[in-house]
């Protein structure tokens, strides 16, 4: 255990010379927590704001998971072609836009525009948002790993991915705390 902590400390100290890696790890820590917040609170939002049943929420989850599978595969091809940075940036932009849409929507209005009583527009929009969250969330996660690979070499990949995993957990409390 002690030697593992020594190795961890040496790796952390070695990051002083890798400013790009440090910036990436810090930004990844926050956007990964944001993505986890989106995943966690999608069902809560659907139940409390849109008054969805458990079956509708389950269907939403399945649709988002299927979108994640297909889009992650397509995103991998895109990542291979253009590299992870533009893939990560576009994914964050799309997911931010989805958050704006979700915040501007309720059962009775869309960005302040009243909807007819019983309108299915909020449901359809939220399903579309679920596809985008699942799809671009999957793309974001896979491109983030590709980016981490580019910040490592064969001699330090285990240590760097360990820090990557640790930092992903370090702020896991933020999204629930900020939303609550």
Segments and roles (model prediction):
Residues 70-84, 110:
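Helix-to-loop junctions at the C-terminal end of transmembrane segments
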Residues 114-139:
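Hydrophobic core of transmembrane alpha-helices in multi-pass small-molecule transporters
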Residues 1-25:
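Juxtamembrane intracellular "pre-TM" segments in multi-pass secondary transporters
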Residues 94-119:
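C-terminal ends and interior cores of transmembrane alpha-helices
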Residues 54-55, 154-164:
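Loop-to-transmembrane helix entry/capping segments in MFS-fold secondary transporters
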Residues 80-95:
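Cytoplasmic membrane-interface "Motif A"-like loop-to-helix N-cap segments
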Residues 139-153:
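Intracellular juxtamembrane helix-capping segments at the cytosolic ends
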Residues 40-57:
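Short amphipathic helix-loop junctions that connect adjacent transmembrane helices
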């Amino acid at each position: 255990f002690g030697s593992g902590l020594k190795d961890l400390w040496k790796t952390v100290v070695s990051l002083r010379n890798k400013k790009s890696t440090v910036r990436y790890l810090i930004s990844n820590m926050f956007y990964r927590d944001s993505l986890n917040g989106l995943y966690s609170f999608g069902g809560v939002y659907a139940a409390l704001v849109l008054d969805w049943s458990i079956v509708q929420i389950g269907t939403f989850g399945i649709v988002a998971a299927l979108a994640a599978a297909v889009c992650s595969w397509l995103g991998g091809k895109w990542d291979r072609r253009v590299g992870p940075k533009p893939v990560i940036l576009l994914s964050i932009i799309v997911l931010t836009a989805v958050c704006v849409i979700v915040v501007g929507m309720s059962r009775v209005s869309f960005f302040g525009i009243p909807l007819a009583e019983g309108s299915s527009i909020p449901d359809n929009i939220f399903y579309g948002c679920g596809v985008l969250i699942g799809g671009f969330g999957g793309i974001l996660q896979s491109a983030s790993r590709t980016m981490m690979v580019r910040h490592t070499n064969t001699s330090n990949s285990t240590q760097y991915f360990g820090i990557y995993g640790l930092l992903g957990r370090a702020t896991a409390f933020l999204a629930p705390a900020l939303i609550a």
